[in-house]
Amino acid sequence: MLHLHHSWLCFRSWLAGMLSVLLGLVPSASSNISTSRPNILLLMADDLGIGDIGCYGNNTMRTPNIDRLAEDGVKLTQHISAASLCTPSRAAFLTGRYPVRSGMVSSIGYRVLQWTGASGGLPTNETTFAKILKEKGYATGLIGKWHLGLNCESASDHCHHPLHHGFDHFYGMPFSLMGDCAHWELSEKRVNLEQKLNFLFQVLALVALTLVAGKLTHLIPVSWTPVIWSALWAVLLLTGSYFVGALIVHAGCLLMRNHTITEQPMRFQKTTPLILQEVASFLKRNKHGPFLLFVSFLHVHIPLITMENFLGKSLHGLYGDNVEEMDWMVGQILDTLDMEGLTNSTLIYFTSDHGGSLENQLGRTQYGGWNGIYKGGKGMGGWEGGIRVPGIFRWPGVLPAGQVIGEPTSLMDVFPTVVQLAGGEVPQDRVIDGQDLLPLLLGTAQHSDHEFLMHYCEGFLHAARWHQRDRTTWKVHFVTPVFQPEGAGACYGRKVCPCFGEKVLHHDPPLLFDLSRDPSETHVLTPASEPVFYQVMERVQRAVREHQRTLSPVPLQLDRLGNIWRPWLQPSCGPFPLCWCLREDGPQ
């Protein structure tokens, strides 16, 4: 027996030695990471629903290029945006922090930046991952949508410009696409402004007529001065109501290259080729790396600008055409990487800034996305349909192909992940809410580092998620929007559901869902149906209190003072509103 035991010990020692030698000869993924810094390509869609993509369950929309990323990489199925609208979500993405920390929220209903000529924007004291990567020697570029502010005190100070937030190069829209850019019926601003101007015109016209009648009949002792002024203002308001659509197009629908306006207003038939041309140029120019390129697609936000060769090709109308065109754009970018020999040295990430819009509807025609099995959509801070988004990472030879991860992750996680990959350090002077995803992506960790995630609507906490490891994921809703009509799952007749006021419900006790068994949030749990109801509520409430203690008061960038149009802040390539320029000719 002793002889057998001794032989077994010898064999085990020999086996351990051989394994050590073999492991020393075979480089691991983690050792590859430690010895090389990848190029980083971030792709973000605008308003894309998680159910719009083939690899997330859509079998009628053709997205072969995005699907290929998932086949060759890692797909996240519980990937969460920090906000359900673009401005706060993008601020959180770039900084790794809840938007309430940077003040990129509102308390009065102005949930995104409303104008290019507003003073609000991503504060200059916020640190983006682009700033850190630039300091680490990366060439940094942003192509596409910004929508995080531009100017503070003058039309040329560009205090919120991407070039002041760590990007070496910018080409795209400082603002955002909107229905008004194409004079759509689905208008974000024009219709509302026309109604206000017409109302004020009627009031002033009535005042002027009353004063005239009173003066002529000697019933109102008044001079002609107030009569003339009220009549003049009435005429100006009437004129403004007729031209407000054109003013909005010139004010917001423009393209910039770095600090220079290149198109005002934009020629949409050339926009997609221009974006692709710019991406290819950046990749070729910086192929010796390392580089960080953030491609922030204008797709699939209304007015769904689509090239002629994609019109009518999908099974889902103009929205489907636009999604399929965006997927084609992804394919063109992947082809450029292949041609430049950059595929294996580039980490690619694909996502959307939030869920698809359900309220983008005219008659029976839907112009917004599909959020699959998840309740709600764009603008709803708590429901999964507004915040659960695609999340795909691909890095050939490093990340396992075809991997699917169901752990809770966040858009905010991109910040610490790319900073770590670049050899940088996450700031220690502020709270960073994102977590490094590398251990999860590589398979060296089985669980997400997010135990809790908070779900805000503007500055109001609507819900919280508790990931109870090895058990389940709980979701607690404190506030939910009132759907119109009741049970419709959306707020039809409005642009988005509100965050506060009469059109929301405050729940006491809060609503509880088990997302692991009920991802569609259809079965509300009660103390009678869930034995640990009170324990879950107590633990989540405690986590909320702990989170709130980490918040500090900051100026709200999206409130009224920072979110009104100021003529002296309006970027223009000529005297506004008589501005028109075309400084670059796109592909023919």
UniProtKB/Swiss-Prot annotation:
Give the active-site positions: C86, H147
Q: Which residues does the record list as glycosylated?
A: N32, N58, N125, N258, N344
The listed locations are: Golgi apparatus, Golgi stack
Question: Record's PROSITE patterns?
Answer: SULFATASE_1 (PS00523), SULFATASE_2 (PS00149)
- The EC number(s) attached to this protein equal 3.1.6.1
Q: Which residues form the signal peptide?
A: 1-31
**Which GO MF terms does the UniProt record name?**
arylsulfatase activity; metal ion binding
What SUPFAM superfamilies does the record tag this protein with? Answer: Alkaline phosphatase-like
Question: Which residues hold substrate?
Answer: K145, H301, K378
Which Gene Ontology CC terms are recorded? Golgi apparatus; Golgi stack
Q: How is the cofactor bound?
A: Binds 1 Ca(2+) ion per subunit.
3-oxoalanine (Cys) is carried by which residues?
Answer: C86
Note the superkingdom of the native organism: Eukaryota
Catalysed reactions listed for this entry: an aryl sulfate + H2O = a phenol + sulfate + H(+)
**UniProt xrefs under InterPro entries:** Alkaline_phosphatase_core_sf, Sulfatase, Sulfatase_CS, Sulfatase_N
List required co-factors: Ca(2+)
Print the keywords alphabetically: Calcium, Glycoprotein, Golgi apparatus, Hydrolase, Metal-binding, Signal
UniProt's post-translational modification comment states: The conversion to 3-oxoalanine (also known as C-formylglycine, FGly), of a serine or cysteine residue in prokaryotes and of a cysteine residue in eukaryotes, is critical for catalytic activity.
Q: Where does Ca(2+) bind?
A: D46, D47, C86, D353, H354
For this chain, the family text in UniProt reads: Belongs to the sulfatase family.
Primary role: Exhibits arylsulfatase activity towards the artificial substrate 4-methylumbelliferyl sulfate. May be essential for the correct composition of cartilage and bone matrix during development. Has no activity toward steroid sulfates.
**Protein name, please?**
Arylsulfatase L
